[in-house]
Amino acid sequence: MDKTVKYYMAPLESVTTWIYRQAHAKIYGRLDKYFIPFLEPHEKRDFKTRELQEILPEHNENIYAVPQILTNRSEGFIKLAKALKDWGYEEVNLNLGCPSKTVVTKGKGSGFLAKPEELERFLTEIFDALSGEVKISVKTRIGKEDPEEFPALLELRSEER
């Protein structure tokens, strides 16, 4: 096991934009990973201009950028992850941590943690569909309401794929 300390930049909406990530890397040196503020899969339209600016490969040159996906639908996650892979991204991140009320009430972000059966099905579907194609990491909270929820969350995907 590699015990080297890794440094990652978490996304902060409207702060850690592509311009900020590039300036940070140039001034302070590159971190190991930069997580891009979340994208949501769109079925009926292309990316918003702001989203497109964040994921354009030329805006993420010379850094290891990881797009973050916010959804509770495996089909949308899989489709978006494959599109991001085609753009050159090696890894995507599932956002299970966002505490925003508008996100949580839709069962996304940390709101998805309250539905362990659905979450387990979702995780199985995305890991099975994307195995060997793109790396998937997960940003989560230790529970939706209580830290005691964490052990059960860990059991959802305890086997390594």
Each model region followed by its residue ranges:
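Active-site glycine- and acidic-residue-rich loops that bind
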Residues: 14, 75-76, 135, 140-154
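Glycine-rich, positively charged N-terminal anion/phosphate-binding segment
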Residues: 12-83
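Hydrophobic faces of well-ordered beta-strands that scaffold small-molecule active sites
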Residues: 7-10, 34-36, 65-69, 92-94, ...
